[in-house]
Regions:
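Short glycine/serine/proline-enriched coil/turn segments at secondary-structure junctions
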Residues: 94, 103, 328-330, 344, ...
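Beta-rich accessory regions
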Residues: 38, 69-74, 337, 356-357, ...
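Short glycine/acidic-rich loop motifs that flank beta-strands on beta-rich extracellular proteins
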Residues: 80, 94-95, 114-116, 136, ...
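Short, T/G/N/S-enriched strand-turn elements that build extracellular solenoid repeat scaffolds
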Residues: 72-75, 91-100, 229, 238-244, ...
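Mature catalytic domains of secreted/periplasmic carbohydrate-active enzymes
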Residues: 84, 116-117, 124-126, 226, ...
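Right-handed parallel beta-helix
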Residues: 107-108, 146-154, 223-233, 246-257, ...
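Short, ordered loop/turn segments at secondary-structure junctions
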Residues: 49, 53, 116, 245, ...
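Extracellular "leader-to-stem" segments immediately downstream of a signal peptide or signal-anchor
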Residues: 2-12, 16-84, 89-102, 106-221, ...
Length: 467
C-alpha cells in the first residue's frame, strides 16, 4: 500500500488533508453564466460563390486566393453574408477574413494551401510562440474583424508534410536535411532575443530564410467568432490560434495534424471561449491555453479567461487540455467536462507548464467527468520548472492555485498526479482530486514536491484508496 503513501511522504512540502469540499455544481453554474456572455455570429442571407469570382478547381499551379479574397471583400462591403467554397478541390494561397462574412467550405470541398513560401510574405503582425512579431502570413488570417465564421463539412488542408513546411522545425524526423531553411538556424533565437530585450515590434520582421512557419488559422484582435464542422489537416504550425479575441466558439471541428508544434487549438489572451464536440489528433498539445511569453506577455498583461471545453475527444498529443507554457499574462477560469482521451501517445491529460521566465497567476481550473483509456505519463501534471535551460530574464515566480479534478478515470499511466513546484511550497496550492480512479499506474502513485494543500478524496490508485 503503502507504496503510494511512501512515495508521497518522502517528497517535500506536501499536505494531504481533509479540506472543505469543492462545489463543482456551483463552479459549473458559473461556466453556464460565462457561456451566456459569448456573443453569437449572425449573417445576412446572401451567398457569394468563389467560382463566380474566377476560382477554378484542380489548378495547383494557379492558386485562386485572389478570387477568394475578392469574394470575401465584396461580401463584407455589401453588408455581409456567406462566401461558399463549392464541392471540388481548390488550390489557394493566403486568405483574409473580413467582418460579417461566413466562410463556408461545403461538404465535398477541399481547400489546399500552396506550399510556395513566397506567397505568405510580406508578413503580418501576429505572435509566434507567444512573441510579438511580423511573420509569414497565416494561411487564414483576420485582424480586428467582428462577426466572422469558418464553417461547413469540407476540408481545409495546410499541406504540411516532410516535404513542405515541417522540415523548417529543424528535425530530421520531419524531413529536415543539412542546408535546409530552419527556425533553429538563428530565426527563433533572434525572436527570443527581441522579446528579452523589449525590441519594438515594428523591428521584429521575420523573413522567409528564418524558417518561422505560419499558423493555419490566426485571428488577431477579433470578436464574435464561430469555427464549426470543418476538418483541418496538416498545418505548417499551430492549427487554430485566436489571439486577443473575445466571444469564440469552436464546435464540431476535426483536427488532424501530426506535424511539429502541431497544437490543435491555442486561445491566447482570449476571453469567453467555448470549445465543444471536437476531435483532436495532433503532434503536440490538443488544446493549449496561452497569454504571451515572458516580457511580451507581461507587457500586455492580458490573461486568457473563461474558457469552456466539453464533449471533446483527444486522441493523440502531448497534452489533452494544457495551460502554458507561454502564459506570462496569466489564466483564470477553465471548465473541462465530459471529454474522452485515449492514446499511448497522449502524454498527459491535464497539464500546466510554466517557469520563472514566465511568471503569472494561473487559477480556478475545474475538470470533471473525463474518461481516459491510457496516457503515457501523468493524469495531472503541474510543472513550474518547464524548460529550465531556456535563456531568459528569470525571477518571475508563477503561482498555480485552485485546480480541482472530479470523476476522472484512467486505465493506464505511469503516474497519477505529478507536481513539480519551486524550492518552496508557496507557488502551487489548493489542488484536489476526488471521486477518481487511476488503474495500472506503473510507478505506483503520485509524485509531488514544492506544493501544499493537496487533497485527495476518494481517489483510488491501482485499487488502493489514497489517504
Amino acid at each position: 500500500m503503502k507504496k503510494v503513501i511512501g512515495i508521497i511522504s518522502l517528497l517535500l512540502s506536501v499536505t494531504l488533508a481533509t479540506a472543505n469540499p469543492v462545489d463543482f455544481d456551483k463552479a459549473f453554474k458559473e461556466s453556464a453564466k460565462i457561456e451566456k456572455q459569448i456573443k453569437k455570429t449572425s449573417f445576412p442571407d446572401r451567398t457569394y460563390l468563389i467560382t463566380d469570382f474566377g476560382a477554378k478547381p484542380d489548378t495547383p499551379d494557379e492558386p485562386c486566393h485572389e478570387a477568394i479574397n475578392q469574394a470575401i471583400v465584396t461580401c463584407s462591403l455589401n453588408g455581409g453574408g456567406t462566401v461558399v467554397v463549392p464541392k471540388g478541390t481548390f488550390y489557394t494561397g493566403p486568405i483574409t477574413l473580413k467582418s460579417n462574412v461566413n466562410f463556408h467550405v461545403e461538404e465535398g470541398a477541399v481547400l489546399k494551401f500552396s506550399t510556395d513560401q513566397s506567397l505568405y510574405f510580406p508578413g503580418v503582425i501576429t505572435r509566434w510562440e507567444g512573441l510579438d512579431c511580423y511573420n509569414a502570413r497565416p494561411l487564414i488570417y483576420a485582424y480586428g474583424e467582428t462577426n466572422i465564421a469558418i464553417t461547413g463539412k469540407g476540408t481545409i488542408d495546410g499541406q504540411g508534410s516532410k516535404e513542405a513546411w515541417w522540415p523548417m522545425c529543424g528535425s530530421p524526423r520531419y524531413g529536415w536535411k543539412e542546408g535546409m531553411v530552419a527556425q533553429r538556424n538563428g530565426g527563433r533565437e533572434r525572436l527570443l532575443m527581441y522579446g528579452e530585450t523589449s525590441t519594438p515590434i515594428y523591428k521584429r520582421i521575420m523573413k522567409p530564410e528564418d524558417g518561422m512557419r505560419p499558423q493555419l488559422i490566426n485571428l488577431y484582435s477579433c470578436n464574435t467568432i464561430l469555427i464549426e464542422d470543418v476538418t483541418l489537416l496538416n498545418s505548417p504550425f499551430w492549427v487554430i490560434h485566436p489571439l486577443f479575441c473575445e466571444s469564440l466558439i469552436v464546435r464540431g471541428v476535426h483536427v488532424f495534424n501530426r506535424g511539429p508544434n502541431g497544437d490543435g487549438c491555442d486561445p491566447e489572451s482570449c476571453k469567453n471561449v467555448l470549445i465543444e464536440n471536437c476531435t483532436f489528433d495532433t503532434g503536440d498539445d490538443c488544446i493549449a491555453i496561452k497569454s504571451g511569453r515572458n516580457q511580451d506577455g507581461r507587457k500586455w498583461n492580458i490573461p486568457s479567461e473563461n474558457i469552456i471545453v466539453r464533449n471533446c475527444f483527444m486522441k493523440n498529443g502531448h497534452g489533452g487540455v494544457v495551460i502554458g507554457s507561454e502564459i506570462s499574462g496569466g489564466y483564470r477560469n477553465l471548465f473541462v467536462e465530459n471529454c474522452r482521451m485515449d492514446s499511448p501517445n497522449l502524454d498527459r491529460v491535464i497539464r500546466i507548464k510554466t517557469s520563472t521566465c514566465r511568471g503569472g497567476l494561473i487559477e480556478n481550473v475545474f475538470v470533471r467527468n473525463v474518461a481516459v483509456g491510457q496516457c503515457r505519463e501523468a493524469v495531472l501534471r503541474i510543472n513550474l520548472q518547464y524548460e529550465n535551460r531556456e535563456k531568459c530574464n528569470r525571477g518571475y515566480a508563477p503561482t498555480v492555485r485552485n485546480v480541482h479534478l472530479k470523476n476522472v478515470t484512467c486505465e493506464k499511466s505511469k503516474l497519477g498526479v505529478l507536481i513539480i513546484g519551486l524550492d518552496d511550497d508557496k507557488h502551487v496550492y489548493n489542488v484536489s482530486v476526488e471521486d477518481s480512479r487511476f488503474n495500472n499506474v506503473e510507478k505506483g502513485g503520485n509524485q509531488i514536491k514544492g506544493a501544499k494543500d493537496i487533497t485527495f478524496k476518494n481517489l483510488y490508485i491501482n485499487g488502493e484508496l489514497v489517504k
